[in-house]
Amino acid sequence: MIVFLVGGESRLMDALITKMEKDGHKTYLLTGKRDGRGKYRRVFERYNFPYDSESVREIFTNVNPDLVIFLGAYDTNYDWSDARRESVRYTADLTNLLSAYAFKQNGRFVYLSSEVVYGRSYSSDIHETEPASSKSFQAMAILQGENICKSYRDTREMDTRVLRFDHMYDIPRKGKADNNPCFQMMLEMLKTNQIAANSRNVFP
């Protein structure tokens, strides 16, 4: 199978590349950056283009992948410190990726989402029928990504799948900031020598 991974450098991306190669799939990579910097595991071919590039459609057409996986909520190319601006770029990038891949009649597009779309902590398991209630610009952008995928599935009959990963964290690369609760709490502890918590925070 021909697999096209889309996302910035991260341990998750490395794990996906390793898994695809181990399973014998021909793996391609779109980095989302033009400069070519970044440490990735070796793939069959790597493309250094931003997601909104007009070249993305030509790349997808030439490679003709059976499966495209967009890291979405876990893509390190996005800096959510200015979430209002980044949310616009995020949804525009996803739309361009889906539009570029729409030519493939029997291909599958997988979008990685996260639990942030629910907007709060839950003390028990979240059922898939639980309505999303995203509050931050980042969460709203990620949820909008799910809706965009659904729209392409309904209107273009594309095989789009949304995977919501719950509390998936890792050790950030040296010198890289992260946006997950564990990173934020550790940063707070280093700055203030304490971690604030209240009844709204659940630590299972």
Walk through the language-model features, giving the residues of each.
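NAD(P)H-binding glycine-rich loop region in Rossmannoid oxidoreductase-like domains
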Residues: 50-90
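Conserved catalytic-core motifs of eukaryotic protein kinase domains, centered on the activation segment
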Residues: 40, 78-85, 120-124, 174-175
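NAD(P)-dependent short-chain dehydrogenase/reductase
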Residues: 150-204
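Conserved glycine-rich Rossmann-like NAD(P)H-binding loop of the short-chain dehydrogenase/reductase
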Residues: 25-34
